[in-house]
Amino acid sequence: MTALPRRIGMLGGTFDPVHIGHLRGALEVAELLELDELRLTPSARPPHRDMPSVTAEDRLAMVQSAVAGVSPLTVDDRELKRDKPSYTLDTLESMRAELAPRDQLFLLLGWDAFCGLPTWHRWEELLEHCHIVVLQRPDADSESPDAMRNLLAARAVSDPKALKGPGGQITFVWQTPLSVSATQIRQLLASGKSVRFLVPDAVLAYIDARGLYRAPNTDGSS
């Protein structure tokens, strides 16, 4: 009997720190697409963003604590093991090599990241390895950049559940709007305010135990 193709998702990010917006969005997509596994993949040296505020080890530990016991969410640390920029194409190629030919691989991207794809390393090759699932918010600008219009005309599928084959198509998934950002959380922590209910309790405990994101003490006291 032929085994059914596996359905694997990837959500990359700095996760600096991971928060409920990341996690709720990931879980919604995993359930909608009936994924066997959705891998949260922390990036080490993101080419298109500032360097993270805390170490890779801390960011990885926070993501691991956030998804512990939450199926089908898992953590993939391969980008943290590379001594070079975290190019998504390299990660997809590596993941694809581990899967069976018929297995489906889904790359989850936020709207802003999707619109910025033309600036990514060898971005035209991404769809050779995966489907792209764009996480869309009701308040987002829905006008796609000119560079993406021909691609969308050729590859877009309106029903996320209708994606066929191991890769090559693009679809959009509407997200529950949660106005939470890692920047906001870092600012709250730096000002001494609580971020309870913006991050999982296990992540908050980790942040508190290590004093992450706190403003440095400048008053001369120990």
UniProtKB/Swiss-Prot annotation:
Its EC number is 2.7.7.18. The keyword NAD applies. It catalyses: nicotinate beta-D-ribonucleotide + ATP + H(+) = deamido-NAD(+) + diphosphate. SUPFAM superfamilies: Nucleotidylyl transferase. Pathway: Cofactor biosynthesis; NAD(+) biosynthesis; deamido-NAD(+) from nicotinate D-ribonucleotide: step 1/1. Keywords: ATP-binding, NAD, Nucleotide-binding, Nucleotidyltransferase, Pyridine nucleotide biosynthesis, Transferase. The keyword NAD applies. CDD domains: NMNAT. One of its GO terms (molecular function) is nicotinate-nucleotide adenylyltransferase activity. Belongs to the NadD family. This is Probable nicotinate-nucleotide adenylyltransferase. It comes from Pseudomonas syringae pv. syringae (strain B728a). The gene is nadD.
